[in-house]
Swiss-Prot record:
Its main location: cytoplasm. GO terms for biological process: tRNA wobble position uridine thiolation. It comes from Pectobacterium atrosepticum (strain SCRI 1043 / ATCC BAA-672). This is Protein TusB. InterPro entries: DsrEFH-like, Sulphur_relay_TusB, Sulphur_relay_TusB/DsrH. The gene is tusB. It comes from the Bacteria. Belongs to the DsrH/TusB family. It is found in: Cytoplasm. Keywords: Cytoplasm, tRNA processing. PANTHER family: PROTEIN TUSB. The keyword tRNA processing applies.
Length: 95
C-alpha cells in the first residue's frame, strides 16, 4: 500500500499511521508532511523503526528550504517517481 502524509506530523494521527504500516508499504511525505523527515527529530526515528520505504517529495522540501535537513534514510523523489509509486501500489491511503 502507498501511504501519503501531506500535513504536518504534529497535526496527524501519527500513532494510527504507524500501526497501519506493513512490510512492503511505502510512505511518501509531501507538502507539510516533509517535516516528518527532518534529521534528529523523534518522528523520523519512529518512521524508520516501521521498516517501510520512506520517500519525500523534493519540490516540497525545496519550497520549505529543508532539503539539506532531510534524513539520509529518506529517498528524495520528483513527481515522475511519485507517479511511478502510485502505479506500483494500486492501494493508497492519504493521511
Amino acid at each position: 500500500m502507498l501511504h501519503t502524509l501531506s500535513c504536518s506530523p504534529y497535526h496527524a494521527d501519527l500513532d494510527t499511521l504507524l500501526r497501519s504500516l506493513e512490510q512492503g508499504d511505502a510512505l511518501v511525505l509531501l507538502q507539510d508532511g516533509v517535516i516528518a523527515a527532518l534529521v534528529g527529530g523523534d518522528i523520523i526515528h519512529r518512521l524508520l523503526d516501521s521498516a517501510v520505504l520512506l520517500y519525500a517529495l523534493r519540490p516540497d522540501t525545496e519550497a520549505r528550504g529543508m532539503t539539506e535537513q532531510i534524513s539520509n534514510s529518506v529517498v528524495l523523489i520528483g513527481y515522475n517517481e511519485f507517479v511511478q509509486l502510485t502505479v506500483e501500489h494500486p492501494q493508497q491511503l492519504a493521511w
